[in-house]
Amino acid sequence: EVVSGYTAFIIGIRSIVPEAVMTVQYTNIWEDYYLEKVCAEQLIDEGCVVISQHSDTTGPAVACEETDSSRPVYYISYNDSMADIAPTTYLTGTKINWEPYIEQAVAAVLKKKNIEDCINGNIHGNDVSAGFEQDWIQMLALNEFTAAEGSRECIDTLVQKFKRKQLQVFCGEYTGTDIND
């Protein structure tokens, strides 16, 4: 989940800024406010201008918001809007909508069927994934204060393309079997 998440993130960024590079800091834990904030601060000190996370606290958003205003840095959240935590740096984010999966998984169990046989998604062994087209992924609110002009229209267009299966994230040169590929 983490590797596919940050791979999708850099692919999206490079669709707008092809020369963008990404530095990843691992915390090796889902929830550690201090460690997440320190990692974000280190990335900001190294010159990163967009910070995101695949962890569960407000630490990275707070680090962005506390950055000296002479150094532009923006924050994109994961699973929760951070607009109230980082009102001058938060751009937008995505979240996982667990409702479709839970409903289908419970229905499978009640019917005494394998969950994988009853899920409307992409099955990978015992794992399953889906996107905007099945409403498993949703956009969080766009911060109109920090977002560039035209961001709303661009996001809406891309989400519609995903829903119509006119756009795929994982195609092209990004393939591998481990994080070092």
Segments and roles (model prediction):
Residues E1-D181:
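A residue-level marker of the well-folded mature domains of exported/periplasmic proteins
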